[in-house]
Amino acid sequence: MPTVLIVEDDPINIRVFTKILTKRGNFEVLCSEDVEDILAIAASGKTDAIVMDVSLTNSVYEGKSVDGIRITQILKSNEATKHIPIVLVTAHAMQGDRESFLKTSGADGYISKPVIDHQAFVDQIKEMMA
């Protein structure tokens, strides 16, 4: 069964994403907002895709606060993890953000919160994993 790592700091969003991904997508789900943990999970091959919140309040890497854009850049610049599909999710979607976030981060997909079309969310992840 494919596994999706959810990188999110809001417990409600974690619950919602977990339910959508397990019920509709038949995925296993891992959750973390700890950067070292995220990098270790990705490098270990334990995840087939990542759902990455853009705005993370508690994530720190090398002593600095980092957001989902920066974590995605780190993952995409590493030979061992750059192949893992990453979908950015954000509640702060403004006109032009999608293209800007995708270009800056190197992520493979983007969806705004709240996730209204649950099946489209699952389908986007499945398509990237194919």
Regions inferred by a protein language model and the residue ranges of each:
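Alpha4 helix (beta4-alpha4-beta5 surface) of REC/receiver domains from two-component response regulators
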Residues: E62-V66, R70, A93-I111, Q119-V122
